[in-house]
Amino acid sequence: MIRLGGWCARRLCSAAVPAGRRGAAGGLGLAGGRALRVLVDMDGVLADFEGGFLRKFRARFPDQPFIALEDRRGFWVSEQYGRLRPGLSEKAISIWESKNFFFELEPLPGAVEAVKEMASLQNTDVFICTSPIKMFKYCPYEKYAWVEKYFGPDFLEQIVLTRDKTVVSADLLIDDRPDITGAEPTPSWEHVLFTACHNQHLQLQPPRRRLHSWADDWKAILDSKRPC
């Protein structure tokens, strides 16, 4: 059951409490070092944005051309649809601006289980870091509702809503967007590209690396950022 009435007044005023198991020093690991901080993107990493969009687009506009997932190229869905036919960009945007779009997205395979396990690791703080769309009538609320549905109410403290992820301090950012820019030219985090239909064809230059899916060895990526 979604219990969002309470947190609107209560949780947003409280300080975030990291999800990982901490030492007694409020964020320090058991050996006295700082906990590893991991940011996990939501759409395309936890929630199946691309699949959810395509299903709803085809249902609402059955007579319009569409782009199969294997043919998706580029992060911005609306741009590729706009090149396909005039007017399709606006139709695409109308899908994710609609009520319940974000809430009804299905989790990607293994995503919920992996992030719950990640958050339970010693000396590890996990935050869901997501950028709401500018048409904010439904999106921010539904993102919170989605997290509560799949991760439970306590994980609401672990959400970071921001249009600029470069200003958020962390060790790792797992995100499907290939190019993440903002006010901070040198973010503190390493960007690990999560493989999605729109970016799977890209060749990354070392030292950049991917997480191909939640069945991939995400623990090894985290361990590579921990002190020896």
Swiss-Prot record:
Its cofactor is Mg(2+). This is 5'(3')-deoxyribonucleotidase, mitochondrial. Mg(2+) binds at residues 41, 43, 176. GO terms for cellular component: mitochondrial matrix; mitochondrion. SUPFAM superfamilies: HAD-like. Pfam families: NT5C. It is found in: Mitochondrion. GO terms for molecular function: 5'-nucleotidase activity; metal ion binding; nucleotidase activity; nucleotide binding. Dephosphorylates specifically the 5' and 2'(3')-phosphates of uracil and thymine deoxyribonucleotides, and so protects mitochondrial DNA replication from excess dTTP. Has only marginal activity towards dIMP and dGMP. Highly expressed in heart, brain and skeletal muscle. Detected at very low levels in kidney and pancreas. It comes from the Eukaryota. Homodimer. Substrate binds at residues 43, 49, 75-77, 96, 130, 165. The active site is at residues 41, 43.
